[in-house]
Amino acid sequence: MADENKFEQAKGNVKETVGNVTDNKELENEGKEDKTSGKAKEFVENAKDKANEVIDKFKK
């Protein structure tokens, strides 16, 4: 999943850059959305991992 989130962020960065260079605001905004979505998913995934680590410590 982490790779997918990084890919989504990179894809968003490319879209945003191309949209900016070509003055295509729709593509630029789509890129911003992809980047934000990828970052949010990555944050949630990291939070889940940390929560599971804490839970595992209490199980021992």
From Swiss-Prot:
Record-linked InterPro entries: CsbD (IPR008462), UPF0337_stress_rsp (IPR050423), YjbJ_sf (IPR036629)
Q: Which organism is it from?
A: Staphylococcus saprophyticus subsp. saprophyticus (strain ATCC 15305 / DSM 20229 / NCIMB 8711 / NCTC 7292 / S-41)
Range of residues in the leader sequence: none
Protein name according to UniProt: UPF0337 protein SSP1134
As for family, the record states: Belongs to the UPF0337 (CsbD) family.
Disordered as annotated region, ranges: 1-41
Write down the superkingdom of origin: Bacteria
Regions of compositional bias (Basic and acidic residues) in chain numbering: 23-41
